[in-house]
Amino acid sequence: MSSDTLTETAAPIHSDPRPVSQATQRQGFRLTRFEVLNWGTFDRQIWHLDNSGDNCLLTGNIGSGKSTLVDGLTTLLVPPRKLAFNKAAGAENKERSLESYFYGYYTSQQDESGKARAVGLRSKGNHYSVLLAQFHSVALQQTITLAQIFWLKPGENKVKRLFVVVPEALDIATHFSDFGTQIKALR
């Protein structure tokens, strides 16, 4: 029996009736870009991860920001009441919070009374933080952007947030900059 005969008579292990271009196409919405501004220790500039919808592996030393980025993406995807920070690192529930990421807490110092006090990169209320993720579906030829903007109202201590869902590609530099702390300018 020739190899041509084997090839012709052997049944494929998996048969997909779609054309090869459709069968190999990535299904669903895939993350294409992730941006952060003033999130954790990612401070004062826009930091971005471009992966074009490909799989991505975050690597780095302890304390390099891997869990901070994962928590940022999780913040965009999980309802606030169900959000648990730093699960990727197996940390205690109270170790990180929305406030710790907003202020950029990176260490603690003892005050005059001996109590530990968190030290952050950003002072209270004079900044805003932004998380933004773009997702694209090749099959639907559609892009969706999810974003959250965090800020403090004057005289308040609780971090406020604005949710954004837009059926197009947005970015922080173009769409979420230069409004100071005037969140009404965004709406």
Question: Can you name each region flagged by the protein language model?
Answer:
Residues 1-187:
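Extreme N-terminal "head/tail" segments of very large remodeling/mechanoenzyme assemblies
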